[in-house]
């Protein structure tokens, strides 16, 4: 795979490969409080980790969730109860016991707009060797 775009601030990348692989479908629906979600990732280095939870709230680009998100899980998909991707897990808060994901709107806006500015900072750019 090659890096097409990279967002260092949010620890996210868009990769491309010449191989045909199965892909997850993106949801057309916004999440709401109580919505069931599943987070996939590599929690604490354990590849293929899954955690289940619910949406606590949805605010702009942030989805607040009850799923356990630990080191290595960031960048993994947040899946709804129909199997569609609704976000990308991005942070955890151990003390408050809630975690977060970036909504697809927030992620896709940056992915599609290389010059997109978020909070006054240009975050996405073409990756150059």
Please name every model-derived segment.
Residues 1-3, 23, 85-129:
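C-terminal cap/linker of serine protease catalytic domains
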Residues 1-3, 55, 78:
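Conserved hydrophobic positions within beta-strands
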Residues 1-40, 45-49, 62-67, 117-120:
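Conserved active-site neighborhood of the chymotrypsin/trypsin-like protease fold
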Residues 16, 41-44, 59, 73, ...:
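Sec/Tat-exported extracytoplasmic proteins
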Residues 54-61:
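Short proline/glycine- and basic residue-enriched helix-capping loop/turn segments at helix->loop/beta transitions
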Residues 68-89:
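Catalytic nucleophile loop of clan PA
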């Amino acid at each position: 795979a090659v890096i097409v775009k990279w967002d260092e601030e949010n620890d996210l990348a868009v990769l491309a490969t010449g191989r045909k692989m199965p892909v997850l479908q993106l949801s057309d629906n916004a999440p709401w409080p109580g919505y069931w979600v599943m987070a996939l990732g590599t929690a604490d280095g354990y590849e293929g980790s899954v955690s289940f939870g619910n949406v606590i709230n949805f605010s702009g680009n942030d989805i607040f969730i009850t799923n356990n998100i630990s080191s290595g899980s960031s960048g993994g998909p947040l899946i709804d109860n129909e199997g569609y991707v609704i976000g990308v897990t991005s942070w955890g808060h151990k003390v408050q016991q809630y975690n977060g994901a970036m909504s697809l709107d927030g992620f896709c806006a940056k992915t599609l707009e290389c010059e997109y500015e978020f909070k006054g900072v240009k975050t996405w750019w073409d990756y150059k060797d």
